[in-house]
Amino acid sequence: MSAKSTPDAGPQEQATEAEAELRHRWQALADEVRDHQFRYYVRDAPVISDADFDKLFQQLEALEAEHPELRAPDSPTQLVGGAGFATDFTPAEHLERMLSLDDVFNVDELTAWSSRVRAEVGDDAAYLCELKVDGLALALVYRDGRLERAATRGDGRVGEDVTLNARTLDDVPERLTPSDEFPHPAVLEVRGEVFFRVADFEALNAGLVAEGKPPFANPRNSAAGSLRQKNPAVTARRPLRMVCHGIGYTEGFSPTSLHEAYGALRAWGLPVSDHTTRVQGMDAVRERIAYWGEHRHDIEHEIDGVVVKLDQIALQRRLGATSRAPRWAVAYKYPPEEAQTKLLDIRVNVGRTGRVTPFAYMEPVKVAGSTVGLATLHNASEVKRKGVLIGDTVVIRKAGDVIPEVLGPVVDLRDGTEREFVMPTHCPECGTELAPAKEGDADIRCPNSRTCPAQLRERVFHVAGRGAFDIEGLGYEAAIALLQAGVITDEGDLFTLTEDDLLRTELFTTKGGAVSANGRRLLANLGKAKAQPLWRVLVALSIRHVGPTAARALATEFGSLDAIIEASEDQLAAVEGVGPTIAAAVKEWFTVDWHCAIVEKWRAAGVRMADERDASIARTLEGLSIVVTGSLAGFSRDEAKEAIIARGGKAAGSVSKKTAYVVAGDSPGSKYDKAIDLGVPVLDEDGFRNLLENGPQAPEG
């Protein structure tokens, strides 16, 4: 029995439960942030506005600031945005880390940043004010003046090789143009942003619509999607532009300031913005921010803020960087834009766990550079809180996303024809009566999770997601086709699909009556997916609250699905990163017969239900709790964790008296400080390698 259900639980039990609930709150928020980062950086299709994402990110930062023990190396606050997501492009390692930027949203936050900077460099430092172009970050490498490679940011260390596509851009020269003043360097890594001019974006979308293809939601998505085409010929047909805004690794080029570096880039034939201004002091910085806030639509491309950088490179080096962003630069982001439109209707959508979500269906309106007609309303309570009626003129806010936010109604424009939204009492897909999952929940759900068509579609689609089995070819259209044809009854049937099954679906059948190439690829990918690790199986089961982080923790702790099923709720909750809420959801899920039937179907089809340990790797860290903080040159975040786990250790996210070692890389942060305070041994990367190989008796670096 948990402390919560014991009336006379002591302070220690209550404190333990409070800590677990706090960690669950952090984990849920971190998982939500990573989910939106995936949609933004990999799928080029965000589902919330930049402003809403910024709020989520700030909530996570605030929670970690209040409880530093929660701040793990794999927290989104410690990583560059695209970290940890696999793609179809060849990995390309940056010569020097390609960091992101910290954001500020008002003058007070800008002042706080400038105060920290001035404390180090004084009041009269020179700054560069650059327009923050809303596009896709790109790094170009020139060797002896010739373009060698182009790569996206990725996780800051490794991006995607898009060299062939980048070569099609008019703004990317194949060769640098040397001069007596600026001979080209032996090696030059230059950073920039790929974007569409507004007029070019509108023309592109018009062409797509004329061809019967879906248009892009906004210029940023179109730039990312166009540069990341598998066929460079498609990229070549789209008028992408680029502007350079920084340098990385160099040989034979040592500028003393960014201003000087930009002059050299321009001389070599690289595109540099004409709108960048060098100013003295923060008063001048604030003036430039105010100016561009009023003139943001006077230029040919969209901007969402101004980037402020220290100009002197020596001062930049003095300030250094965190694991994700330089301390010498910051992005001042303008408030998201607003518009008014007519709320034509409020409709509902049913998700894979049965959650019924209302959304606004509006007259299309141009805002922030794109046309918008839909917006989420979250739940019935939110609709009531905002006070919107069907037929209202509403204010919407958008910051370059696909689905904007409805702020509220313009009450003075009501004419009496408006009507109140009534949340349906029964599922619009299957007719089942709706109800909250538990008393007090704001969300209502369709309890017919087994056969509700909407939930089935979403679950089948979820099985193929990158965070689950990662099955290429099983998209939303395929999920619908398989279910409608009766080829599968639920996700349990996926791994027994045959060519004969696919011939029953028009989607996977050629005009000649054979299985299409896409169908054959789907079957092959389903076969490969059977060997995916246990944590992906757990995610694919659509257990409420179980995302990749909790799934990894459970798989690492128990090793097999059977062991997880047999574990008690207390044993599950004791796993770091799980907690009582997730533990209860896991136990509840496995009490449902048809849930277990899905597992047994997968098991019978050969899906891997246990992680095999490599017997050739010595268990040098058996029982040791090890925390890795900062950036390691030879290990990614996941590689360091896997190395610890494979040797019997526990890759912990926070430092305590039970921590055996803390491994500190570049910019280690508060975990390093806590280790020193607690007297926990701290290892550098060489010491970590020795520890992995030889165990605790290894010399400490």
UniProtKB/Swiss-Prot annotation:
All copies of domain BRCT, residue ranges: 616-701
GO CC list: cytosol
Region (Disordered), start-end ranges: 1-21
EC number from the UniProt entry: 6.5.1.2
GO MF annotation terms: DNA ligase (NAD+) activity; metal ion binding
CDD domains: BRCT_DNA_ligase_like, LIGANc
Residues annotated as binding NAD(+): 50-54, 100-101, 130, 153, 193, 309, 333
Residues forming the catalytic site: 132 (n6-amp-lysine intermediate)
Keywords annotated in UniProt: DNA damage, DNA repair, DNA replication, Ligase, Magnesium, Manganese, Metal-binding, NAD, Zinc
Substrates-to-products reaction catalysed: NAD(+) + (deoxyribonucleotide)n-3'-hydroxyl + 5'-phospho-(deoxyribonucleotide)m = (deoxyribonucleotide)n+m + AMP + beta-nicotinamide D-nucleotide
One Gene Ontology term from the biological process aspect of the record: DNA repair
Signal sequence coordinates: none
Protein name: DNA ligase
Gene behind the chain: ligA
